[in-house]
């Protein structure tokens, strides 16, 4: 494919246009009086959201150079979301100002490299000060963080705080759609562990990059699976049951993984594979725990069990499984409490008999995972659009509250950033030339979130920032009053602010130091009736039955590379 090349001011101008297009759409959502954004969908009703990263991921600009700028800023939101779970709009607002001021100064002849160094020094200084001001939280403060992070929804805040109280802050909390109009909290059996899907092709929700199955079956084994022949009998059985299948094994790779991916993407099977947690003997123990939780059988080499003899009765069952890139959460059915209690008692007896501190630690971890349970927040709403919006708010509140417990809190509403910005004056004076300019850029960016929160509340942003500096108090956009925001319950998680700043300066400094952009030349539209797009799976193979491989036919199961 041919490329288009742009350089110097022309390239940076196109990037900034893309940054502004995305940031202007996202920043209207910040604060308690932030507005909603309507996203058109190819199929079904449009989504109405006020979640920054959801909006950012949906934006695709026609101009390829501007689109590159938009996608770079989307990375700011996505990185902050992945690491902190919240603060995506704050990160976007910060990055927009940093990019604008940085490019304005480089166009006037400043050195982009020196500006970047100054910006990085300023952010490092701010992060140190931020952590010094951090206050640890518990009790009512957890409720306040959850309420603020959900956009001021007290019902959501109370539910998130209650869930954390019941299963602990480190416990497993999942969010799912309710069959009723009410939003409810339920505590059930379940487990989570740090292993994700074997291939991103197993993802069922591309926007959130997760694989989620309702009422799946589980094949649990300590074997490594490389040949599809090992799986054919169980796949045939599962295909007839029409249930999703999750394969939990030492590893699934090679021909077996490729075939599962092909058939999942062709809609023949709802399937995913996950690498088993832990290592060695502890892996077998962890798999046995999961087998008890799901009323399944561990297909183990130690018992001379083989995969070709697996029946439907050997497969575990769960109410729901959610698999991300890095973790798996199993929500068990309601009929496993007796078995789980018996398993926990067995592990406790083992704990009493060991003298090793390391073994005790690992056994206690297993007990915590099995006995801790899972808090399920069931989200209800009158319409599907409101349901999706409410679900996003709850997920934001959960993530932000965890972040607040982890690194503490500071006053919210952008007021802390403004006060920290005032401490950059001494750093700016200690630096020369363009590095000092970089520090000044960060200082200006730090007032942007408070300014935008005020604008969304119908106030003059510059006046509000000036009053915050004069009074030494924060601006409560919900009431229009200047007050002590921590006492008012308007608080931000230090981790969220820290990551928003660090991610924003990371991408902004890259944009400022860009000299050349190379983009794909847009292809002309194909004539009507022409050939359609190719198979998105490329050369992953035909739909030939497995009978041609000398294996039992699977009624349309595809093999990679077969024509």
Curated annotation (Swiss-Prot):
Sorted keywords for this record are: ATP-binding, Chaperone, Cytoplasm, Isomerase, Nucleotide-binding
Main enzyme class? isomerase
Location (main, coarse): cytoplasm
Catalyzed chemical reaction(s):
ATP + H2O + a folded polypeptide = ADP + phosphate + an unfolded polypeptide
**Subcellular locations according to the entry:** Cytoplasm
Give GO cellular component annotations, separated by semicolons: cytoplasm
**Single GO biological process annotation from the record:** protein refolding
Which Pfam families did the record assign? Cpn60_TCP1 (PF00118)
Origin superkingdom: Bacteria
Tell me the PROSITE patterns matching this sequence: CHAPERONINS_CPN60 (PS00296)
- What residues does ATP bind to? 29-32, 86-90, 413, 476-478, 492
SUPFAM superfamilies, alphabetically?
GroEL apical domain-like, GroEL equatorial domain-like, GroEL-intermediate domain like
Name the segments for region: Disordered.
520-545
UniProt-listed Enzyme Commission number(s): 5.6.1.7
Instruction: Spell out the Gene3D superfamilies in the cross-references.
Output: GroEL, GroEL-like equatorial domain, TCP-1-like chaperonin intermediate domain
> Which GO terms label this protein's molecular function in UniProt?
ATP binding; ATP-dependent protein folding chaperone; isomerase activity; unfolded protein binding
Show the ranges annotated as biased composition (Gly residues). 529-545
Q: Which NCBIfam families match?
A: GroEL, PRK00013.1, PRK12849.1, PRK12850.1, PRK12851.1
What is said about its interaction partners and assembly? Forms a cylinder of 14 subunits composed of two heptameric rings stacked back-to-back. Interacts with the co-chaperonin GroES.
PANTHER family linked: 60 KDA HEAT SHOCK PROTEIN, MITOCHONDRIAL
Described function: Together with its co-chaperonin GroES, plays an essential role in assisting protein folding. The GroEL-GroES system forms a nano-cage that allows encapsulation of the non-native substrate proteins and provides a physical environment optimized to promote and accelerate protein folding.
Q: What family is reported?
A: Belongs to the chaperonin (HSP60) family.
The molecule here is called: Chaperonin GroEL 1
